[in-house]
Amino acid sequence: MRITWFGHSAFRLDFGESHVLIDPFFTGNPAFEGGDAARARAVEGATHILITHGHGDHVGDTLAVAAETGAKVVTNYDLCMWLGSKGLTNFDPMNTGGTTDQGGFKVTLVRADHSAGMSEAGVTVPLGLPNGVVVRAPGEPTVYHMGDTDIFGDMALIQEIYRPDVLIVPIGDRFTMGAETAALAVRKFFAPRAVIPCHYGSFPIIAASADAFVAALDGSGVQVVVPHKGTAVTIA
């Protein structure tokens, strides 16, 4: 599997015939580099878009990318219905605890401790529960993108049920858990092959780097991968 980080919480997973974008926040993302050409490369051939929750920095370019590529959008029911009201037609609604078979892989929505909603005409529209997403494909590492969340004890159940090989962990503080708490979550609940930090280095009011997270996991035996933005890393 090739995993590409585009800054903030935006990722792409490439495996087999599947090309999966998660939280495709390009336009307006201060951490996204390379402009229109990089965006075109990031979305080229996308087959699916997974959205962890209904905030603008995670919904991002979903409508535009879906229109450009024909990618199927997979997210919670409420957010699917809202996107449908904006013209999206190719979507697969689900909810927390549910699993859907996308052909070459399965998606499960799991718990996240956060909020979700978008502002329209000065009114916040609730958009269902926030989630993490677990992606499982035959012969590929299982990936758990936590979305935006704090630590919670039932992460132990996520480990027991899904045994993720790759964790994508928010570390930026303020809107999610910070570096030390995120490191505690990794050490206490999981046994991954690799951990990738996210949700930092974008907006000035969250953490600027992953240094504190890396330091907090030093000596733990956990492999922390801090990718260069736009450059794929391969995890077998």
Swiss-Prot record:
Gene3D superfamilies: Ribonuclease Z/Hydroxyacylglutathione hydrolase-like
Alphabetical UniProt keywords: Hydrolase
InterPro entries in UniProt: Metallo-B-lactamas (IPR001279), RibonucZ/Hydroxyglut_hydro (IPR036866), UPF0173 (IPR022877), UPF0173_UPF0282_UlaG_hydrolase (IPR050114)
Protein name: UPF0173 metal-dependent hydrolase M446_4343
Domain of life assignment: Bacteria
Family recorded in the similarity comment: Belongs to the UPF0173 family.
An example molecular function term from Gene Ontology annotations: hydrolase activity
Pfam family, one: Lactamase_B_3
Native organism taxonomy: Bacteria, Pseudomonadati, Pseudomonadota, Alphaproteobacteria, Hyphomicrobiales
